[in-house]
């Protein structure tokens, strides 16, 4: 295990350029890449992409389909700072932005952008924070610190790329943080990680 490689800073980058970097690296020299949201598709648990679709996209045989939920995705992106704010306030952890595009030290195809990073107030240990939002009818997926499997794969992949031991989600679905916010945490699990990278 080793620290990740910082490939580039995505601050101010256009969406098209960001997508190019995610697909082939900033120099265009990586034949194919895997990102955190791809992992669920590889394992067949993504609600949005099948393993075959992902393979065809990565091999250049198919263009990504326009997302039916493009407005929801945009809204989720816009709400990330709110999810990060409430996580910081409720957990006491120091949360900060990191606009880097990172590459796994041992698996050059594995790239990651993190929603946020944090340092634990209890011991200063670093972690990766994934910021999510959902509708009320999806809130039960987060009940009792549950994590939807497709998101768990994503965060476990990010922990591996970042080479850190802790991760957390901040997911909200309403305007009352006392009842409408879930903040489940996970610890790095090398057995599960090996499943992802084998």
Model region roles, listed by residue range:
Residues 1-78:
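Charged, glycine-rich intrinsically disordered N-terminal tails and low-complexity linkers that flank
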């Amino acid at each position: 295990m080793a620290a990740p490689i910082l490939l580039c800073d995505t601050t101010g980058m256009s969406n098209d350029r960001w997508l190019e970097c995610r697909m082939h690296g900033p120099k265009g020299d990586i034949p194919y890449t895997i990102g955190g949201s791809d992992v669920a598709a590889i394992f067949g648990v993504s609600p949005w992409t099948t393993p075959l679709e992902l393979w065809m996209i990565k091999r250049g045989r198919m263009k990504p389909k326009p997302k039916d939920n493009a407005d929801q995705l945009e809204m989720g992106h816009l709400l990330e700072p709110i999810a990060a704010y409430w996580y910081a306030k409720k957990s006491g952890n120091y949360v900060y932005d990191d606009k880097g595009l990172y590459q796994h030290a041992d698996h050059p195809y594995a790239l990651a952008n993190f929603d946020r990073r944090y340092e634990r107030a209890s011991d200063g240990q670093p972690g990766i924070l994934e910021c999510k939002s959902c509708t009320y009818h999806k809130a039960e997926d987060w009940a009792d610190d549950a994590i939807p499997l497709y998101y768990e794969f994503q965060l476990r992949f990010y922990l591996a790329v970042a080479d850190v031991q802790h991760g957390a989600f901040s997911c909200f679905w309403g305007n009352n943080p006392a009842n409408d916010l879930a903040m489940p945490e996970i610890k790095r699990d090398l057995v599960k990680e090996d499943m992802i990278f084998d």
